[in-house]
């Protein structure tokens, strides 16, 4: 036996002793699927590594409870107090310590200085403190000389049912060690919480503050109570209430007419009979903290999964049968996954955060929601995403010396408890509902299914996902945050750019500083959209700096790599601009990604941690041969590093100036052009800079336009009328491949455009001609099919260039009249059109 365990233990020891200075994700992590047995072993060892944090965080109580039981508590910012921070932290960490003792012995290596006796002692003493300080037992007071928990509608505390659930799990893990008296205290606590659930109103609502999450945790306490005491005479009432809360967690308006019988094995109750009102918008999104919050969007699935888990695990372990079970706990979980989460899932399993976040970034807190759907709904997409997320949690833990899950936690030990809670639940769900026989989807086929541009109208968020990158932008009304970001289609490099919001804006837009004015933004036009396949165009308008400046902007997320940003900024009143910080992208300089970045730019290279702001003149910049920006602005800066929701973040300003500028009302402040690329080298970025052609010297006042290229040679035209009063005429620019054939008719090398204000015209093309006198147009805007007409007798032979998957293809043709040109089978096909 010892020989068999030795290789495993050596492997676990190596896993435990990785040091924080080592890079843990970029250039290290890959997307290979980890089998269930290995993942479960990793999850156990991750929790064992966390035991060092547990021991450091535990505090012995100065006095026992009133019946002489020794107790203690895991510390928080509110140690031993009766609030969420105090009670929830202790309950979660108690549960995790107890779990380790029950499930991990003989399978993991504990950190030096931590013993199984330590964990056993902490688990029991923290459980004693939890049940002793509840209002139902009153065996010991909390730090404020009071108690925690809910008893009835007349005496209740928000969220106490969630804390009670963790207490119940801790008790279950230690059930064989508890005396009958202690089990009685656990029962009194849980029955009191359930009494409140039986009396209270089931709340619903979706505007700004969904009740989905709250109803989910109310279902949890009913489930754990049922599972521990399934033969109690009150059990049928608990079960009925459990189903009501479950249906009204992910409740949707369509439920009112859903006459599906929930549990045919039990009775004929339908969804419609239990439905109280919607907690989700019509498109299955939700809001919490007054905005679209992807952490809350997913966590309800986790809560419902934890209820399913308790019913299965507790009842089968203690009583040998699952007396109580219900399909209500999976209600609409599949819909939320397919209609919302999958559209936001990134290459590392993270869910995109279009609005940024208001707690620690990159927690991968959706892992256990994926687990729920993988284990209980057998969802292959969820299984794949769970695998990615677990690997990222594992790697992030390596950035700490004490087994904590992350550095610079937003809420201290409480965050550690919540994260450990999720890791533990993921293990247990696989323990009771193995996925070993399932085949996960591969990420690239998954991405392709969810690649098309989508406007999430209820939240006013736009997104798409090409083979190169994910893009999103949000006009979140609740928190007045007008920002977005770009995530590379790469498991290890998609956190170079991070979600960021500040001063009502953030990534892409940035801000100006104006003397005597605040940095803020108020929307005038909250998104005019054009969607085409996996591409989108958005126009918007903001008044900024206490309505001193007007910024009209447009973003073209192309079907390829390039993301184009144009704007037109004017002064609304006389003012003094003291600083420009535009074209912003927040860049991680963090232990999780890279603590230093290498910046490549025109005639220069710099390695920096972003702490000091560095200014430089260059029409392009590349970060770590992975992310590039090109612009005609030539004035950039990088630095201003801050702790951005637990991730150290510097700022790349693609348009930067610290020079004072006095502006008159109506005067143009700037007409900026920036193009962003993902998964691109410095050399390619420099080449893209030479391909960028501005059209502003040809366009009327109030217009902005640019022609740019992708590394594969595809070209994109973007022309925006922001405030212009006249139509535009411009000459087709000559590129390195020739004169591009556009979606707009080109006559004699000139294009005429008429656009409304705050609108844009875009096209992508893979066809080029060598002579601007030819009349050209793409057929139905398709970049690979064109009509070309010769109208001059100057020459007979013309060259057509085409961008194909194999690269540039050329064809010289004898032109007479009009022809149809098409890229077909990686060749140029020419067909004469008879008039």
Annotate each language-model stretch with its function.
Residues 661-686, 747-784, 815-835:
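C-terminal beta-strand-rich structural cap/linker in extracellular carbohydrate-active enzymes
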Residues 7-15:
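Bacterial N-terminal signal peptides
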Residues 587-611, 732-747, 797, 802-807, ...:
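Solvent-exposed beta-hairpin/edge-strand motifs
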Residues 1-4:
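Positively charged n-region of N-terminal signal peptides that target proteins for export
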Residues 138-139, 150-172, 180-459:
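Extracellular polysaccharide-recognition and catalytic grooves
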Residues 16-20:
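Sec/Tat signal peptide C-region and signal peptidase I cleavage site
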Residues 21-144, 256:
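Low-complexity, Ser/Thr/Pro/Gly-enriched N-terminal "stalk/linker" regions
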């Amino acid at each position: 036996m010892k020989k068999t365990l030795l290789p495993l233990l050596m492997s676990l020891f190596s896993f435990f002793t990785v040091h924080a200075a080592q890079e843990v994700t970029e250039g290290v992590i890959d997307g290979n699927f980890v089998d269930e047995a290995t993942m479960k072993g990793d999850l156990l060892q991750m929790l064992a590594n966390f035991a060092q944090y547990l021991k450091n965080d535990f505090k012995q109580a100065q006095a026992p409870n009133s019946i002489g039981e020794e107790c203690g508590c895991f510390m928080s910012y509110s140690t031993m107090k009766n609030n969420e921070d105090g009670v929830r932290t202790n309950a979660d960490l108690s549960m995790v310590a107890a779990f380790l003792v029950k499930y991990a012995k003989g399978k993991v290596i504990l950190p030096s200085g931590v013993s199984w006796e330590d964990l056993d002692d902490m688990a029991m003493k923290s459980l004693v403190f939890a049940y002793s300080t509840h209002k139902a037992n009153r065996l010991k007071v909390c730090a404020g000389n009071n108690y925690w928990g809910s008893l009835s509608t007349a005496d209740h505390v928000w969220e106490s049912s969630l804390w009670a659930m963790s207490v119940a799990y801790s008790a279950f893990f230690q059930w064989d060690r508890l005396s009958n008296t202690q089990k009685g205290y656990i029962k009194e606590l849980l029955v009191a919480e359930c009494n409140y659930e039986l009396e209270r109103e089931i709340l619903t609502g979706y505007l700004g503050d969904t009740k989905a999450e709250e109803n989910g945790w109310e279902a949890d306490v009913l489930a754990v109570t049922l599972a521990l005491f399934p033969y109690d005479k009150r059990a049928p009432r608990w079960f009925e209430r459990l189903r009501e809360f479950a249906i009204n967690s992910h409740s949707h308006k369509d439920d009112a007419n859903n006459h599906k019988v929930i549990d045919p094995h039990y009775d004929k109750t339908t969804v419609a009979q239990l439905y109280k009102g919607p907690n989700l918008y019509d498109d299955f999104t939700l809001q919490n903290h007054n905005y679209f919050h992807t952490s809350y969007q997913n966590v309800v699935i986790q809560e419902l999964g934890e209820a399913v888990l308790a019913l299965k695990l507790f009842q089968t372990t203690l009583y040998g049968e699952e007396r109580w079970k219900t399909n209500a706990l999976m209600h609409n979980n599949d819909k939320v996954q397919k209609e919302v989460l999958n559209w936001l899932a990134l290459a590392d399993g993270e869910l995109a955060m279009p609005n940024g976040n208001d707690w620690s970034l990159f927690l991968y807190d959706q892992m256990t929601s994926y687990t729920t759907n993988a284990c209980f709904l057998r969802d292959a997409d969820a299984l794949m995403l769970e695998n990615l997320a677990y690997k990222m949690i594992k790697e992030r833990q390596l950035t700490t010396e004490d087994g904590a899950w992350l550095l610079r936690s937003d809420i201290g030990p409480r965050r550690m408890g919540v994260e450990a809670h999720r890791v533990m639940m993921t293990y247990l769900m696989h323990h009771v509902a193995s996925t070993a026989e399932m085949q996960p989807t591969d990420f690239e086929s998954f991405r392709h299914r969810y690649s098309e541009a989508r406007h999430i109208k209820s939240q006013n968020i736009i997104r798409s996902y090409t083979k190169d990158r994910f893009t999103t932008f949000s006009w979140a009304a609740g928190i007045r945050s007008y920002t977005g970001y770009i995530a590379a289609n790469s498991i290890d490099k998609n956190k170079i750019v991070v979600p960021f919001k500040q001063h009502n804006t953030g990534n892409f837009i940035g801000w100006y500083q104006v003397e005597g004015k605040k940095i803020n933004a108020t929307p005038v036009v909250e998104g005019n959209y054009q969607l085409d396949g996996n591409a989108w165009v958005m126009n918007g308008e903001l008044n900024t700096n206490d309505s001193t400046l007007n910024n009209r902007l447009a973003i073209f997320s192309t079907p390829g790599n390039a993301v184009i940003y144009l704007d037109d900024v004017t002064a609304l009143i006389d003012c003094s601009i003291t600083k420009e910080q535009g074209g912003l992208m927040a860049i991680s300089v963090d232990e999780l990604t890279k603590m230093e970045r290498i910046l490549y730019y025109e005639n220069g290279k710099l390695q920096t941690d972003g702490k000091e702001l560095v200014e430089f003149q260059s029409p392009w910049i590349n970060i770590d041969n992975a992310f590039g920006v090109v612009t005609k602005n030539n004035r950039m800066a990088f630095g201003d590093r801050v702790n951005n929701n637990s991730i150290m973040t510097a700022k790349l300003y693609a348009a930067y100036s610290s020079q004072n500028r006095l502006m008159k009302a109506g005067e143009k402040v700037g007409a900026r052009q920036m193009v962003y690329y993902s998964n691109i080298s410095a050399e390619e970025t420099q080449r893209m800079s030479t391909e960028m052609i501005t059209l502003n010297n040809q366009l009327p006042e109030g217009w902005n336009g640019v022609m740019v290229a992708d590394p594969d040679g595809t070209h994109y035209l973007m022309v925006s009328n922001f405030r212009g009063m006249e139509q535009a005429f411009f000459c087709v620019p000559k590129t390195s491949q020739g004169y591009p054939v556009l979606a707009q008719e080109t006559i004699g090398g000139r294009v005429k455009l008429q656009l409304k204000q705050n609108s844009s015209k875009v096209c992508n093309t893979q066809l080029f001609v060598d002579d601007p006198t030819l009349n050209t147009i793409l057929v139905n805007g398709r970049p690979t099919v064109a009509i070309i007409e010769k109208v001059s007798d100057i020459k007979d032979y013309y060259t057509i260039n085409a961008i194909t998957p194999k690269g540039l293809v050329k064809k010289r043709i004898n032109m007479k009249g009009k022809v149809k040109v098409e890229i077909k089978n990686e060749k140029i096909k020419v067909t004469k059109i008879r008039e």
